[in-house]
């Protein structure tokens, strides 16, 4: 979402407040309670609002946050583009948006918000009609499933996944699923390193960045509030996954890694984790 112009009438009011600055600060592990006090009560389901993702990817986006008039607000850099997220909270959304637009103006940047969903678009159009342009990018869309679907895999659409799981069970009847605990972090790191070697992570910017975020998350697993699980075959790790709640009714699965030589490992770790995600 971008503003069409920096000259629309609301700036007459904003200019009167131009000496005020939003107190943005870097997102750190110490900010977990503050940030989740807003996100857990929200209806927003964007994976960008996961505290783990905010911290783990800060190296790439320089993510900052602030609390403004009962709203949680974020700003970050997507390459050379300064961007904001839709404010999270309750109250006068229009006033907070004006403050963000003014913040962008002081940065000599066009106001841009990323991660805006269709329901948020309706809110923006109602608050500031005709002032924004909207561009859809499905490459950044989140996939949302019902937990009951992934934990039961009933129906024709999950037939392929059931087949993978059945083959896994038949081939490895003595497999074990265990939660990720501090003493098991290293074996997750070892599998990730092997996966990256096979997939040449360090030769690709995208997978290289993902690796850096994943390693940070594993090293700060408990501080981030993560939950995860591991699959073992013959006492050897073959898959792991982890994530955390995004809000009061949505859980974000942030990572799934598996040994590609073990058929069905990806499907199995997804199924087992779906059956154990905390309520």
Segments from the language model and where they lie:
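Short, low-complexity S/T/E/D/G/P-rich linear segments that nucleate or cap local secondary structure
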Residues: 2-6
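Conserved donor-binding loop and adjoining core beta-sheet/short helix segment
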Residues: 37, 47-119, 232-260
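Conserved GNAT-fold acetyl-CoA-binding loop/helix
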Residues: 46-49, 200-215
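Amide-forming acyltransferase catalytic core, primarily the GNAT-like/NAT-type
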Residues: 8-11, 15-69, 204
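Accessory, usually C-terminal, subdomains that scaffold auxiliary metal cofactors
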Residues: 209-279
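Acyltransferase donor/substrate-recognition loop-hinge adjacent to the catalytic core
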Residues: 130-204
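Short, glycine/charge-rich beta-strand/loop segments that flank catalytic centers
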Residues: 110-127, 138-142
């Amino acid at each position: 979402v971008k503003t069409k112009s920096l000259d629309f009438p609301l700036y007459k009011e904003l200019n009167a407040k131009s000496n005020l600055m939003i107190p943005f600060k870097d997102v750190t592990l110490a900010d977990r309670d503050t940030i989740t006090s807003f996100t857990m009560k929200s209806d927003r389901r964007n994976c960008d609002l996961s505290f783990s993702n905010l911290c783990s990817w800060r190296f790439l986006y320089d993510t900052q946050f602030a609390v403004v008039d009962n709203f949680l607000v974020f700003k970050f850099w997507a390459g050379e583009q300064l961007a904001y997220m839709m404010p999270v909270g309750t109250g006068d959304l229009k006033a907070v948006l004006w403050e963000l637009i003014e913040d962008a103006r002081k940065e000599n940047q066009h106001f841009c918000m990323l991660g805006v969903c269709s329901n948020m678009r309706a809110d923006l159009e109602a608050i500031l009609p005709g002032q924004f342009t909207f561009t859809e990018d499905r490459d950044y869309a989140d996939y949302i499933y019902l937990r009951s679907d992934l934990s039961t895999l009933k129906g024709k659409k999950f037939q392929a996944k059931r087949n993978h799981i059945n083959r896994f069970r038949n081939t490895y009847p003595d497999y074990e699923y265990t939660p990720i605990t501090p003493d098991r972090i290293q074996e997750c790191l070892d599998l990730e390193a092997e996966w990256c070697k096979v997939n040449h992570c360090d030769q690709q910017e995208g997978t290289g960045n993902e690796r850096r975020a994943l390693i940070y998350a594993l090293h700060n697993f408990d501080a981030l509030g993560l939950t995860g699980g591991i699959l073992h075959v013959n006492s050897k790790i073959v898959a792991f996954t982890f994530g955390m709640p995004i809000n009061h009714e949505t859980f974000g699965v942030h990572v799934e890694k598996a040994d590609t030589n073990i058929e069905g490992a990806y499907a199995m770790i997804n199924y087992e984790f779906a059956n154990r995600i905390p309520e």
